[in-house]
A protein has these predicted regions:
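Extracytoplasmic gate region of multi-pass secondary transporters
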Residues: 72-121
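A membrane-interface helix-boundary motif in multi-pass transporters
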Residues: 23-38, 216-235
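C-terminal transmembrane helical hairpin of 12-TM major facilitator-type secondary transporters
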Residues: 134-180
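A late C-terminal transmembrane helix in Major Facilitator Superfamily
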Residues: 187-223, 231
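Small-residue (Gly/Pro/Ala) motifs that create kinks and tight helix-helix packing interfaces
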Residues: 11-23, 95, 126, 209-218
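Multi-pass alpha-helical transporter architecture, strongest
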Residues: 43-51, 229-252
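Helix-loop-helix hairpin linking two adjacent transmembrane segments in secondary transporters
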Residues: 3-52
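Helix-to-loop junctions at the C-terminal end of transmembrane segments
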Residues: 122-134, 218-219
Length: 252
């Protein structure tokens, strides 16, 4: 269910609060990791203790299906790569940016708490937008929301810009995660398992490459600004790629 994706925001909120509390007690990073591990174990208890609904067990389809890639599916796959590339840069370095910027140091923990709070209701908002427009438009708007927040942080300094960027990031990321696999299944006529695996692979490649390239940029330029610009532009490109142009032009 799409509603379960709101747990994405709950997890970010709880982890941010836990790290904040650990920092108050001046716990070192290795103890903070231990605290988060314990928190994750506790949160798995409701999952493993809840009985499966009848008929909810996963089935394996052994029928051979053609997995020829359509242009629309390639487009959303490229978009998901750009999303993974751009979103991980901001997610990786926003806390470091706050810590190393005197004007933002006071919000280093509040930034991720705000991301989590914004992410909790986001899937319901994007689902409503999807019903008013269409799934691919809602997906593109999610990407543009993330991009706008990060680019505002690039062009404007200060706490207000940072908090807006975090709120837009939390709001947009959940919409993308919640809708992209659904849209991928729509655009791919073959195996659903193949569609999910292919999209996840392109997303993962973006997550691997993004921090490496942005890390090199941070070392070269000596600040985080250009890495944030790269993140915002990547998410904008993700939005462009997510649009189903064949469907869009057929309705004009």
């Amino acid at each position: 269910r799409l509603a379960h994706i709101s747990g994405f925001g709950v997890g970010m909120f709880l982890s941010a609060v836990a790290i904040w509390i650990c920092s108050m007690f001046e716990l070192q990073w290795n103890y903070q990791w231990f605290v988060i591990a314990i928190l994750c174990l506790v949160l798995t208890i409701p999952i493993i203790s809840s009985p499966l609904e009848k008929g909810s067990e996963a089935s394996i389809d052994h029928a051979s299906q053609s997995n020829k890639l359509s242009l629309g599916f390639v487009g959303i796959s490229v978009g998901y790569f750009f999303f993974g590339f751009g979103y991980i840069i901001f997610g990786t370095f926003i806390a470091a940016l706050a810590v190393n910027t005197p004007a933002l140091e006071s919000i280093q923990h509040a930034s991720w708490i705000l991301v989590g709070i914004s992410a909790m209701p986001a899937i319901f908002i994007w689902q409503a937008i999807s019903k008013l427009t269409s799934n691919h438009i809602s997906l593109a708007l999610s990407c543009f929301t993330c991009s706008a927040g990060i680019l505002i942080l690039y062009f404007f300094d200060g706490i207000a810009a940072s908090l807006f960027a975090c709120a837009a990031y939390g709001m947009g990321v959940v919409g993308i995660v919640g809708l992209v696999l659904m849209e991928g299944k729509i655009r791919h006529s073959g195996s659903i398992k193949f569609a999910v695996a292919f999209l996840t692979t392109t997303f993962s490649i973006g997550q691997i490459v993004g921090p490496y390239i942005s890390g090199l940029m941070i070392d070269f330029f000596g600040d985080y600004q250009n890495a944030m610009l790269l993140s915002g532009c990547s998410l904008f490109m993700a939005g462009i790629c997510m649009i189903n142009y064949k469907l869009l032009f057929s309705r004009l």
